[in-house]
């Protein structure tokens, strides 16, 4: 894998004939990520810094953060200066059954009545929502965010007129990451609550939003010839520039450059603080600040960078793999499972939307970091009478 990615990074051109094609810099970002996963921090830093300093899109535009956070998730602004490596989707292009559209997200829309009309899967957790709470300086509290639960509409009827949105200050990225009752949901109006949720008792009151299209885009940037309008032209972004910056910040921490890491994190946070990019007409209170003083030590820096990845990249498919490579999947996920199922943990209050069916759930270190390899594939790997593939530990 390293050899393939390095070859692509060394040999691909920076500009391509068509936007969206993988170029030298997309390959470099993926190569740097692979090195980071292997804890080759100095090597990862060299590659990721090159991408950060010199990288361009396939069209030749220098990588840069978009002015508005939410534009990263809008089909009208895809293949932007922040898009580094994205799976290209298109609709209404003559293909059969929307085959070139975003089928991978088709089940992950609000449940009935809203955008996509199906199927209410991939719901954000209460733990994630709580993580967006901030202190008086607009900073997150990685250790204590679950000491207070952000108010939700668990069990509140759709026709209730008494529910109000929580008034504690939160990072403005929350409402571009999570759909919650009473807050504008793109241009669909305020999220109506339970009527857009498949089963609150099973998975809570929140809806995904980053993969969702705008109402004004229906039939134009969604496929109009199939059973669901959830097949969209919104690319699936594997790596964006903010991710590159935070991976570089992580590598800087590991090689001892804490101040450079702080600078990079603050740049990401500064974009999120652009009030023009806040959800408009929201009843929520938004606040986000900068890390104005040096981090005390490497441990504090790691904690800040890791928390920033969670907030910036929430619901984009990175979190589990980050926890595994940091070596903290077992304690983090078991703490979460205790919290969400109402078991006593860290003196946190029992969540309003606790999951009783998770009462016996447990993450086993050394096993659950990886799926089992299908037995059929192991059987087919026989060479010279010996099976080449070996089953992952614990299965």
Predicted regions and their residues:
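Acidic/polar-rich alpha-helix caps and helix-coil junctions
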Residues: 2-107, 113, 137-395
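C-terminal cap/substrate-recognition region of VAO/PCMH-type FAD-linked oxidoreductases
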Residues: 108-117, 122-123
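Acidic-aromatic substrate-binding/catalytic surfaces of carbohydrate-active enzymes
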Residues: 121-134
């Amino acid at each position: 894998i390293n050899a393939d990615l390095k070859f692509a990074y060394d040999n691909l051109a920076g500009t391509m004939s068509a936007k969206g094609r993988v170029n030298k810099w997309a390959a470099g970002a993926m190569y740097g990520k692979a090195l980071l996963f292997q804890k080759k921090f100095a090597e990862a830093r060299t590659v990721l810094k090159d991408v950060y300093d010199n990288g361009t899109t396939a069209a030749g535009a220098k990588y840069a953060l978009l002015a508005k956070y939410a534009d990263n998730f809008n089909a009208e602004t895809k293949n932007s200066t922040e898009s580094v490596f994205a799976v290209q989707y298109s609709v209404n292009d003559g293909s059969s059954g929307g085959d070139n559209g975003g089928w991978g997200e088709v089940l992950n829309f609000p449940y009935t009545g809203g955008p996509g009309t199906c199927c209410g899967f991939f719901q954000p957790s209460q733990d994630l929502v709580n993580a967006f709470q901030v202190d008086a300086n607009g900073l997150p509290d990685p250790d204590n965010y679950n000491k207070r639960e952000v108010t939700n509409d668990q069990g509140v009827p759709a026709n209730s007129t008494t529910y109000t949105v929580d008034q504690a200050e939160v990072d403005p990225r929350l409402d571009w990451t999570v759909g919650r009752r009473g807050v504008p949901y793109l241009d669909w109006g305020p999220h109506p609550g339970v009527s857009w949720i498949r089963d609150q008792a099973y998975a809570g009151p929140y809806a995904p939003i980053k993969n969702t299209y705008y109402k004004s885009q229906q039939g134009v940037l969604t496929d109009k010839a199939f059973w669901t309008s959830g097949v969209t032209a919104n690319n699936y972004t594997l790596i964006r520039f903010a991710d590159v910056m935070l991976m570089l910040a992580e590598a800087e921490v590991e090689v001892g450059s804490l101040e450079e890491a702080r600078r990079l994190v603050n740049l990401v946070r500064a974009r999120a603080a652009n009030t023009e990019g806040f959800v408009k007409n929201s009843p929520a209170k938004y606040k986000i600040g900068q890390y104005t003083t040096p981090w005390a030590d490497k441990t504090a820096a790691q904690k800040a960078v890791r928390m920033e990845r969670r907030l910036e990249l929430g619901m984009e498919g990175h979190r589990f793999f980050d926890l595994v490579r940091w070596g903290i999947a077992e304690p983090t996920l078991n703490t979460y499972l205790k919290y969400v199922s109402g078991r006593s943990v860290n003196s946190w209050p029992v969540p309003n939307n606790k999951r009783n069916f998770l009462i016996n759930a447990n993450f086993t270190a050394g096993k659950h970091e990886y799926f089992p390899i299908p037995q059929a594939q192991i059987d087919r790997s026989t060479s010279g009478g010996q099976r080449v593939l070996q089953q992952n530990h614990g299965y």
